[in-house]
Amino acid sequence: VATPGAEPMAFGGYAAALLLDADKMLRFDSLRAPEAALRRWLNAAALVRPAALEGTVVTTASPSPVEQALVRWDPAWFAREELEERAQTGLPPAVRTAAVTGAEADVRAFMEEFLGSSALPERVREQLRIVGPVPLDQGYFAWSESLEEDSEEAPVQGDWRTLMFFSYGIAQQVTRELRATRATIAALKKNVGERPVQIRCDGLDVL
């Protein structure tokens, strides 16, 4: 019995593996939940000896594209399907993202400064898709904990977040202005909260 990521090795491979609570990994409200679940399942299944040597993997997962990718042992197929779907819906990695996180007042002030900057061309501003600011809920923190990725800059309870989606074509201008806005706010000491707002581009755990 082992938790995901802590499976011990067995010389010659295990005779069998039972992937318990498989559906639980898919219930997280995150864009990355399916790919994270598949990665963990494949890592565990890879410790089992080949089927030609009577190795067996049993999963409790309900039928789904993720489960099919495991059964077919074809993560490349799953990745292609997922990428095509995200391209159609305008989600990363088909587009780039920027997350502004911190105290509500600081996030709102940052976005006002950013969008009001004369250095940000109107055509770029019009192409931004902005969601928020909204408070980070318990589901987000549960998902972050499941990733077991510690960070000193990790959001804390009570933080708010604004997400921006933008094409690769305008990414350089957007990220340059994000840096400039952060520098301006820091110089003017406009932060209300104890910490400055956190800006992350293309963060893997923000969706």
Model-derived regions: residue spans:
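Accessory helical-bundle/CTD segments and flexible terminal tails appended to RecA-like ATPase motors
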Residues: 1-34, 43-207
